[in-house]
């Protein structure tokens, strides 16, 4: 039943303009430009770690430590957040590994309700708890003998870009903030891309979620929404093809033990509506004078969010375009991801 619901919602999203243009091959995975989501490094040690957030929920992460790190000193650290609907094994581990190769202690994490982290129901949306998870990661890193607690930064990919901004506004321990292919998860749910969704259309989505709450409270099955399609056909929109190529092929597909291939990437319908009340860019200027870096592909359908955040943020700030890159390209295409820019940013600011 949930797949029928997903198909209806996907069609509605396309009609609302949430999906725009991009071009990828229809069915075969595209491994161009060094796509290497599951990259591992011989020079970096990884260990699974757990810690509690302030809601006493267990958050699970991977801690990456350069093998040649001077154990007699403390070092800067970076928390890395995965795309919305993904898990740490998708994009976040890659970024954490690559930045550890540059000498940083890094920590990728599963947001609550996703992957190995606690939270019921699975795939639930809670922007406040997501932001809290990043602060909890800073809590954890601050206890590590190799980490300088005054030199911790955050890096959010896709939806996590908006979550790290939300967290950083009220957590000054996050000394430097970077986002890659950021989605403002509040704005995209309220307005769709390019503000193509009307208030009346938004109200229909809210009403549908409220109706579903009644059904589920009465014992009905949980419904899931949005996420990535499971099959392609001639009518599949180019942006869904872009996501499909990562999430539904060996390029980036990963199903954690807490989920199933049918449910990965799909948040629950009744909780996803909470994004309507999520305004991460409000008061973004109060993060200043802590530095911010916004990275987006110049071909990315999502670039409006990085551009808007840059416009609103206080100094120091930088908006960096990756030439020829789309939104999902910056999840794993190692030849396109600007590692030098990220290394320069965090080296100077932490």
Protein language model features and the residues they cover:
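Alpha/beta-hydrolase active-site loop
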Residues: 124-145
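Short beta-strand/loop motif that positions the catalytic acidic residue
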Residues: 294-296
């Amino acid at each position: 039943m949930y797949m029928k619901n997903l198909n209806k919602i996907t069609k509605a999203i396309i009609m609302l303009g949430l999906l725009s243009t991009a071009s990828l091959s229809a069915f075969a995975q595209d491994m161009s430009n060094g796509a290497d989501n599951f990259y591992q490094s011989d020079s970096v040690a990884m260990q699974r770690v757990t810690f509690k957030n302030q809601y006493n929920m267990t958050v699970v992460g991977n801690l990456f430590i350069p093998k040649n790190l001077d154990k007699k000193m403390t070092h800067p650290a970076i928390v890395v957040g995965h795309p919305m609907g993904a898990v740490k094994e998708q994009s976040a581990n890659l970024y954490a590994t690559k930045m550890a190769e540059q000498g940083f202690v890094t920590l990728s994490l599963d947001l609550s309700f996703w992957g190995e982290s606690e939270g019921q129901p699975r795939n639930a949306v809670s922007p406040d708890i997501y932001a809290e998870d990043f602060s909890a990661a800073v809590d954890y890193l601050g206890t590590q003998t190799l980490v300088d607690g005054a030199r911790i930064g955050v890096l959010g990919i896709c939806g996590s870009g908006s979550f790290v901004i939300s967290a950083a506004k009220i957590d000054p321990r996050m000394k430097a903030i970077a986002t890659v292919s950021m989605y403002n998860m509040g704005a995209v749910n309220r307005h769709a891309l390019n503000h193509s969704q009307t208030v009346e259309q938004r109200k229909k989505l809210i009403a549908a979620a409220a109706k579903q709450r009644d059904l589920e409270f009465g014992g009905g099955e949980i419904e899931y929404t949005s996420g990535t399609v499971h099959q392609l056909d001639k009518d599949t929109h180019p942006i869904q093809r872009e996501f499909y190529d990562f999430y539904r092929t060996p390029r980036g597909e990963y199903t954690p033990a807490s989920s199933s291939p049918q449910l990965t990437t799909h948040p629950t319908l009744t909780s996803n509506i909470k994004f309507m009340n999520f305004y991460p860019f409000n008061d973004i200027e109060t993060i200043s004078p802590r530095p911010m870096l916004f990275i987006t592909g110049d071909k990315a359908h999502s670039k409006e969010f990085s551009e808007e955040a840059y416009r609103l943020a206080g100094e120091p700030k930088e908006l960096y375009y990756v030439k020829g890159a789309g939104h999902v390209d910056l999840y794993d295409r190692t030849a396109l991801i600007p590692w030098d820019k990220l290394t320069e940013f965090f080296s100077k600011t932490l």
